[in-house]
Amino acid sequence: MMNHTPLLLGIRERLIFALDVPSRTQALEWIDQLGDAISFYKIGMELLASGEYFQVLDDLASRGKRVFVDLKFFDIPATVAGVIRRLSQWPISYCTIHGWHAPMMQAATEANTSNMHLLAVTVLTSMTREDLAKMGINREPVDVVVERALAAHMAGMSGVIASGQEAAAIRHAIGSGFSIVCPGIRTNHVPHNDQQRTIGIKAAFANGADAIVVGRPIRMAQDPQAAAEAMQTEIMTALTEPST
């Protein structure tokens, strides 16, 4: 079942917290600490290595939270299709697949038998043009991102993961009805760390983002719940104030 329509998000579901922790115990501590400030959680590779990944997925679902499985699958089409077929049995809202191979993405969409929405990873926000050149791709990141977004759209994917810096170009190329989820969000006084193509909250939504993924700016805050609530307020303002 090709579920290529965008996921309908409530206004407080547009802030996705990156639950990048090494254990279920720490995951539950963060879920309890953030409370109603966060309704959508991304769980990735670090938790997978703990052996407690699907317990955390169940923990989130039982608390009424949306789940984003961020494992960035990249393999031959048959293998990725098999994984997606199994994941379709779980209460997952978003799941990522690398956007480097159109047949792999199409196989994944055809294997999806649930309301899970598949997102293509375009170019990691930790990568620069120089990084792409070292991989033999001598092009601007935005051009590669748009090309992969178009391929994902043609393959029936629901949307993409991309820097907010490229969201406007994606929206111009594809239009509405295609989800753009943006990591690499940085607020004032928060180090960029390994993120390169970063953007602020207001700019990301102005460029056409549907949702943002935030990890360290919340985890590193003196009061993480207050930081998350402040971001929710900024998102609401960005989505409701008239554009200039």
From Swiss-Prot:
GO terms for cellular component: cytosol. It catalyses: orotidine 5'-phosphate + H(+) = UMP + CO2. One of its GO terms (molecular function) is orotidine-5'-phosphate decarboxylase activity. Its EC number is 4.1.1.23. InterPro entries: Aldolase_TIM, OMPdecase, OMPdecase_AS, OMPdecase_bac, OMPdeCOase_dom, RibuloseP-bd_barrel. CDD domains: OMP_decarboxylase_like. SUPFAM superfamilies: Ribulose-phoshate binding barrel. Gene3D superfamilies: Aldolase class I. GO terms for biological process: 'de novo' pyrimidine nucleobase biosynthetic process; 'de novo' UMP biosynthetic process. It comes from the Bacteria. The active site is at residue 72. Pathway: Pyrimidine metabolism; UMP biosynthesis via de novo pathway; UMP from orotate: step 2/2. Substrate binds at residues 20, 42, 70-79, 125, 186, 195, 215-216. It is an enzyme of class 4 (lyase). Keywords: Decarboxylase, Lyase, Pyrimidine biosynthesis. NCBIfam families: PRK00230.1, pyrF. Homodimer. Belongs to the OMP decarboxylase family. Type 1 subfamily. Catalyzes the decarboxylation of orotidine 5'-monophosphate (OMP) to uridine 5'-monophosphate (UMP). This is Orotidine 5'-phosphate decarboxylase. It comes from Xylella fastidiosa (strain Temecula1 / ATCC 700964). The gene is pyrF.
